[in-house]
Design a protein with these regions (language model features):
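Glycan-recognition surfaces in beta-rich domains, encompassing non-catalytic CBMs
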Residues: 13-243
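Loop-to-helix entry region of an early transmembrane alpha helix in multi-pass inner-membrane enzymes
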Residues: 213-218, 296-300, 308-328, 345
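Transmembrane-helix motifs of polytopic, lipid-linked glycan transferases
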Residues: 226-229, 317-338, 376, 380
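Short acidic/glycine- and proline-prone juxtamembrane loop motifs at membrane-interface regions
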Residues: 359-369, 411
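Membrane-interface alpha helices of multi-pass inner-membrane proteins
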Residues: 397-412, 423-426, 442-448
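Membrane-proximal stem/loop segments at transmembrane-domain junctions that anchor or position
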Residues: 460-600
């Protein structure tokens, strides 16, 4: 082990200790802004502020002590400060606080006499209905059936703290009048005259005082700059671990944070989150009437697991274990290559604290094991890359890779081209190991044939129906009709045979209007699919623009944020007035008793948080960060470019393969705006963040070692 000189100046250490105190104050205030509610000074708020303050002081001091012990080359300080500042600005901007609660709002309603009656029901501050006892009344109001009514000049005023989303509820109908509403200084007049009587809810997003925003942004930026700077200095100062033989299964410890947090989420949303797709597969597994519309292999796994314990929770636990073991195995492999265990724990915690993982891992979807398998493949490909292909030369490893690509091809139908293309890429990239790569490809083909051939026939698995199997073909034909493409008489007749020309529907966001069109003659396309594939290809050759537009429309999930197409995120629905205040199972089927939270106290606050991130109108920045697959891909590509700059090896592109091919296939053959389709890209992005931390640390240590050797010479 090379003893490095202690190059930290005493002034720098003193400055760091002063910054720790200020950082902890700013950090605890920033956390307070994230969690503040209507009651600004409560036991909960005090516990959060004090707890976060002492946590930051203790953690930062521990890291400073370690930095002083191991030493830190001061010349690297600029390399730390710049990314720390940029990340801090990013976090301070993208993580919004509940800042609206830090200012007092005044909401007033004035009836305009002579216009008619005003019926007012109440105010909701975004969290709850405001008690009517808090209203200040002026003029003559009648109060009956929890409603305020007046025909004369009268007013209602409420003063208090609220979220930035506030709503007022009135009644509209014949004879109703006009009211002047002041939304904390923003005045508008609203008429409630209507032909029919009904309830009307007026929503308003209240602006936050710019001074409060500046304070929040400044404290957040300072806190993150100092904390990230200390964290990076600590990581860089870590000495290279002594190379020793690791104990068998040493990597399993990294699964603990993930198993703990995901199990906690399962207890909150017990027995697991289930959509309509989940419940269809659950029913098939229990009736043992299998179809391949949802991959039959995944349904078989559900059948197998529920034969041990007949509960959705058993499936979720299996997903948690699969996820945690794959990630921890990947971390263990990096540690074998010299990564300090501290970075390993940081990677594990990164996966464990992600709200995207909290919600998705406990949802029973085929996309979850598929996405984890994509991550597993990426980890394996990094092993292949880092050994220049030699990893393939062991029979155990070849079988492992064959099983991995087999799972990818069986968990989702679009996984087959991913598996094939990656296998072919290995054959082309590593000539010395070509026979091993070919053997893996052959082994994969044999395994897949055994499952989809003899096994499926034995179990009488029904194939996909025509509307599923040829949905993309139908979608592209619909795109040509939407764009008024010029058709020959023969083409018009062939299209009319499938669906009458007047009944074709096109949506830029989903394939459902075509796939579930009641006029679709599925027998026609089933009996002669080649005919309609040729028809779609002919239309493309005649005029490719409608096809390209269709791909750009429905494939926007992959590469952009399309406000026209609302993404589907989760079956989790926030219901603040219900008991429980959320639903996470779409409907009830045999064997499913409904939502049965084991920790019901956490359901409301956690679901409220998720619900706000689901919306583009609430926590917009968190919505982009958590639920926009295009952001996953952009961050992934940026990190890959940084890794490529460090490694300077073109073969590194291999580890980008699973995410890139998956994204390309979804761009070309997407069917809906479901975020889960690209969940695998999110997991790979998190793994790339871990790779970057390791590569960054390794590169700095290598440079330091080289400079020391040059100095000796």
């Amino acid at each position: 082990m090379i003893n490095r000189a202690k190059r930290i100046s005493k002034n720098l250490i003193t400055l760091m200790h002063l910054q720790i105190f200020l950082m902890s104050i700013c950090g605890s205030f920033w956390i307070y802004c994230l969690t503040v509610e209507e009651n600004m000074i409560s036991r909960r708020s005090l516990a959060i502020v004090l707890g976060s303050f002492f946590f930051f002081v203790f953690t930062a001091n521990q890291m400073i002590t370690a930095i002083k012990k191991h030493g830190f080359p001061q010349k690297h300080l600029n390399k730390v400060l710049i990314p720390a500042f940029l990340l801090s600005v990013f976090f301070a901007m993208f993580i919004p606080g509940s800042l609206s609660y830090l200012q007092t709002r005044i909401i007033s309603i004035e009836s305009i006499p002579g216009t008619g009656e005003i019926l007012f029901e109440g105010i909701n501050n975004g969290d709850k209905d405001i008690p009517h006892s808090q209203f200040v009344l002026t003029g003559d109001w009648d109060y009956k059936n929890a409603q305020f009514s007046t025909n004369t000049a009268a007013g209602i005023t409420w003063t208090g703290r609220t979220s930035n989303q506030i709503s007022l509820t009135f009644q509209k109908g014949p004879g109703m009048g006009t009211a002047r509403i002041s939304w904390d200084g923003s005045v508008e007049e609203r008429s409630f005259q209507a032909d029919e009587s009904s309830q009307i809810i007026l929503y308003k997003t209240l602006p936050v005082n710019i001074f409060i925003k500046i304070i929040y942004f400044s404290t957040g930026t300072f806190f993150f700059t100092v904390f990230i700077c200390i964290l990076l200095c600590y990581v860089i100062s870590l000495p290279a671990p002594i190379l020793k033989k690791n104990s068998k299964g040493f990597w399993l410890k990294y699964a603990i944070p993930m198993i703990f947090t995901f199990s906690l989420m399962l207890m909150i949303y017990y027995p697991g989150i289930m959509s309509g797709d989940s419940l269809v597969q659950w029913t098939q597994a229990h009736n043992f009437q299998l179809t391949d519309q949802h991959p039959a292999f995944h349904t078989l796994l559900i059948w197998l697991i529920t034969n041990v314990w007949d509960s959705p929770a058993a499936i979720v636990i299996s997903q948690i274990l699969f996820f945690s073991l794959v990630v921890s195995w990947g971390i263990g492999n990096l540690q074998k290559k010299g990564m300090p265990p501290v970075i390993g724990w940081l990677i594990s915690i990164l996966f464990a604290v992600s709200p995207v993982n909290w919600l998705t891992v406990i949802t029973i979807w085929k996309d979850i094991p598929y996405s984890v398998s994509l991550l597993w493949l990426t980890i394996i490909l990094f092993e292949v890359y880092s050994t220049n292909g030699k990893w393939l030369e062991k029979i155990r490893n070849s079988v492992l890779l064959s099983i991995c690509v087999l799972l990818i091809s069986l968990f989702r139908h679009n996984g087959l081209p991913v598996a094939i293309l990656i296998s072919v890429l290995l054959v082309l990239m590593f000539r010395k190991q070509r026979k091993w790569s070919i053997a893996i490809l052959l082994l994969f083909c044999i395994f897949r044939w055994m499952v989809t051939g003899p096994l499926y026939q034995k179990l009488e698995v029904e194939p996909m129906t025509a509307n599923y199997q040829y949905a993309t073909t139908l979608y592209h034909i619909a795109a040509h009709l939407e764009q008024k493409s010029i058709l020959t008489d023969q083409q018009s007749n062939e299209i009319n045979e499938l669906i009458p020309l007047d009944d074709w529907e096109y949506s830029p966001c989903s394939i459902d209007p075509i796939m579930w069109n009641p006029h679709l003659d599925q027998a026609k396309i089933s009996n002669n699919p080649l005919k309609y594939l040729q028809l779609a290809f002919q239309l493309f050759l005649q005029d490719p623009i409608p096809d390209l537009k269709a791909v750009a429309d429905i494939g926007s999930l992959v590469y952009s944020v399309n406000p026209q197409c609302k993404p589907y995120i989760s079956p989790l629905v926030y219901k603040p007035t219900a008991n429980p205040p959320a639903s996470w199972i779409d409907f009830i089927v045999d064997g499913i008793k409904g939502e049965q939270s084991k920790i019901p106290e956490f359901v409301a606050p956690l679901t409220k948080f998720f619900d706000r991130t689901f919306s583009l109108n609430s926590l917009t920045s968190l919505h982009f960060l958590f639920w926009c697959p295009a952001i996953y891909l952009i961050i992934l590509l940026l990190i890959f470019l940084l890794l490529l700059r460090i490694e300077k090896k073109w073969t590194l592109i291999l580890i980008l393969g699973p995410a890139f091919i998956q994204s390309l296939i979804m761009l070309l053959f997407n069917v809906a705006q479901d975020v889960r389709f690209q969940y695998g890209v999110y997991l790979i992005m998190e793994y790339f963040i871990g790779l970057f931390m390791f590569f960054f640390w390794k590169n700095l240590h290598k440079r330091e070692k080289d400079s020391q050797q040059s100095a000796r010479k």
